[in-house]
């Protein structure tokens, strides 16, 4: 964390809990003991950061609980966002829990896609000078002209379909 005594903002380094990028965040001095919302510019993850806990964890990484006098900044209407004067590691871990979107599963390729892929490889193996576009066009025509292969009924001996 950068030390700036008379500045109106404090530069803080906050790790994104989704993509693990370290973000340089300018926090107004009046919000240094509040919970602030941070958006990652890399993954656009949005989460709340307890600034007092973040500041304290940077200065004392192995603390269990600390009596910490929280100075009053702002009006009494914002006092509901102030943190208690006793902070524990449990509070910090609760702040870092994030709802991550489900991982995208790799789907099994369709019979058509699998056939086209294999057919293009076969066509290019037989004729290396053919363009990918021509090989794709030929593979699509082969798919249309050989309906028995759509259902996986193609025998190994018939696997070498003729180029249309």
Curated annotation (Swiss-Prot):
Organism: Arabidopsis thaliana (Mouse-ear cress)
Tagged with keyword Zinc-finger: yes
Assembly, per entry: Binds to LUG and LUH; these complexes promote adaxial cell identity in leaves as well as embryonic shoot apical meristem (SAM) initiation and postembryonic SAM maintenance. Interacts with SPL/NZZ and SPEAR2.
Zn finger residue spans: C4-type: 16-43
Single annotated GO MF: DNA-binding transcription factor activity
Keyword tags: DNA-binding, Metal-binding, Nucleus, Zinc, Zinc-finger
Disruption phenotype: Leaves polarity and growth defects.
InterPro entries xrefs: HMG_box_dom_sf, YABBY, YABBY_C, YABBY_N
Function of the protein: Promotes adaxial cell identity. Regulates the initiation of embryonic shoot apical meristem (SAM) development.
GO biological process terms, semicolon-separated: polarity specification of adaxial/abaxial axis; regulation of DNA-templated transcription; regulation of leaf development; regulation of shoot apical meristem development
Protein name according to UniProt: Axial regulator YABBY 5
Family statement drawn from the similarity comment of this UniProt entry: Belongs to the YABBY family.
GO CC annotations on file: nucleus
Protein's cellular compartments: Nucleus
């Amino acid at each position: 964390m950068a030390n700036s005594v008379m500045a109106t903002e404090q530069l803080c380094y906050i790790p994104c809990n989704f993509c693990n990028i370290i973000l340089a965040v300018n926090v107004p001095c009046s919000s240094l003991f509040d919970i602030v919302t941070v958006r990652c510019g890399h993954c656009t993850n949005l989460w709340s950061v307890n600034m007092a806990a973040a500041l304290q964890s940077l200065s004392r990484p192995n603390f269990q609980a600390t009596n910490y006098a929280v100075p009053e900044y702002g009006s009494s209407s914002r006092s509901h966002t102030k943190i208690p004067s006793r902070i524990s590691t449990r509070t910090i871990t609760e702040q870092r829990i994030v709802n991550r979107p489900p991982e995208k599963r790799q789907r099994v390729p369709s019979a058509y896609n699998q056939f086209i892929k294999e057919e293009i490889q076969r066509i290019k193996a037989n004729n290396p000078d053919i363009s990918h576009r021509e090989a794709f066009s030929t593979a699509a025509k082969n798919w249309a002209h050989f309906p028995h292969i759509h259902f996986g009924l193609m025998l190994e001996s018939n696997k070498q379909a003729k180029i249309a």
